[in-house]
Amino acid sequence: MATLQSGSQGTDVKVLQQDLQLLGYTITVDGDYGNGTQTVVEQFQKDNSLIVDGIDGPETQAALNNLVAGIVQGIDISHLNGPVNYNTLSSDGISYVFCKASQGTGFTDPQFQTNYKALTDLDIMMAPYHFFEFENAPAQAQADNFFKCNVDFTKQGILPPVVDIEWQSSDALNQYIIDNQVACVRLISDWLTIVATQTGKTPIIYTNANFWHDYLGNPSGFGQYPLWIAAYQKNPPPIPPGWADYTFWQFSGSGGISSVSGQVDRDRFNGSLDDLKKLAGVGV
């Protein structure tokens, strides 16, 4: 790659910005090597004991490539992200995609079937996720809504089902969780049991350590489910009690890649690509 510096523009600059973002640096992915990018490059150089000149030359590129080489990258999307250029995901370094499938007892994502078909046709690993609701939303009814999306979990390349457990759309709904904590924890447990039984897969739990503590009280009994933790920070994320480590880490809610217009959530897998393929049943 050519040396990049202030004033450079184009695809190579986007790749640089994406890689820095992957390492937890706050940077806009726009293909423009402006003051913001130069400042982040300088910080990266400082953090890695390189000459601090704000120029992405051979030594900086080598250090950056060495750090990102082993990271298995993914994104998570819904209809809110709009059209996705699926054919360029691989060139963006994306190995897997989480796709919103359903929410509560009645909503199914209008983009899900398009995402599902396109990704499986291209042999890109994917996982469907269900956004969990708590009030007037029985576990069986939520599971049935998720099943209506007709995901074939026996197909190679399909990761386990995911339940998204986080803040709700209003203060009143969030307060409901606090006021009915025991019942809400049971609701989650029931959904996981139903989905595991129906699919034959151990579901993945997506959550945030603060939400898990503040709203659910750090409940026990969930450590057997792989953890997808949301933590927008540079350092490794905090892990809720009951888990030894994370399986996936959503490290940015305002990421950027060429395949998606606008911002997109970015993720990294805590393991090798072979480990991820095993989780997705590839080669089994």
Enumerate the predicted regions with their spans.
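Hydrophobic anchor at the start of a short beta-strand
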Residues: I27, M126, K201-P203, L227
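Conserved hydrophobic/aromatic packing and binding residues within compact polymer-binding modules
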Residues: V41-F44
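Functionally critical loop-and-helix segments that line ligand-binding/catalytic clefts
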Residues: A69-S78, T88, S220-V284
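Substrate-binding cleft of extracellular glycoside hydrolase catalytic domains
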Residues: G70-D92, Y96-Q198
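Aromatic-lined carbohydrate-recognition surfaces of secreted/lumenal glycan-active proteins
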Residues: T199-H213
